[in-house]
Amino acid sequence: MTAIIQVENLQKFFKVFKHHRGLGGAFRNLFSREYQLVHAVDGISFDLQPGELVGYLGPNGAGKSTTIKMLAGLLVPTGGRLSVNGQIPWQDRTKYVSKIGAVFGQRTTLWWDLPVVEGFDLLAAIYRLDPADYRRTLDRMVGLMRLERLLDQPVRQLSLGQRMRCEIAAALLHRPRILFLDEPTIGLDATTKLAVRDIVRTLNREEGVTVLLTTH
């Protein structure tokens, strides 16, 4: 079976300003800009098969989020090779994002002042989903994520756990085959973390979605 995600010797380096301390350092910073390379991701290789659910573990600063952003096409690697579902993520972005879903724990794709369901409707319009297909998928996600009582609430009024369930549903409205989850349980209490993980396992088992999830 051909891997749906192929990563070989992936690298991402960032050029960061080197700050010198003290009064002398302040003058040096003012007149001489020095930089250093930070190796955020350095030589990672792995494959994922269709339908796998894989946890990507590591401490803060290990490069987990940077890796997910490269897989999602938000960052271009410094070196190495990367293919997702036969595509290069940062090329032909419009076509690529229609095939994947992504959730970043500290960011939202929904609109803070709009009710949840209106945010879903806007995303359906952006993805140009067939109305009947969208309604079936929405009904499925609402039942799976237990969103019935949340649909008419503005996003800003939701708890963190409620918002995360809505974010995962939003990422799946266009029925992607691949889902990237970057710290989806960050800041959640233990009970809510377990609930989110159960939802992800159910999605993987019943919908066949390939999932890559980062966590500590």
Labelled PLM ranges:
Residues G22-L30, D121, A125, A132-L150:
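Conserved ABC ATPase "signature" region
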Residues G80-Q91, K95-Y96:
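Conserved ABC transporter NBD signature motif
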Residues R175:
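Conserved catalytic motifs of ABC-family nucleotide-binding domains
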Residues L194-E207:
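Helical segment within the ABC ATPase nucleotide-binding domain
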Residues L179-D182:
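Catalytic Walker B motif of ABC-type/P-loop ATPase nucleotide-binding domains
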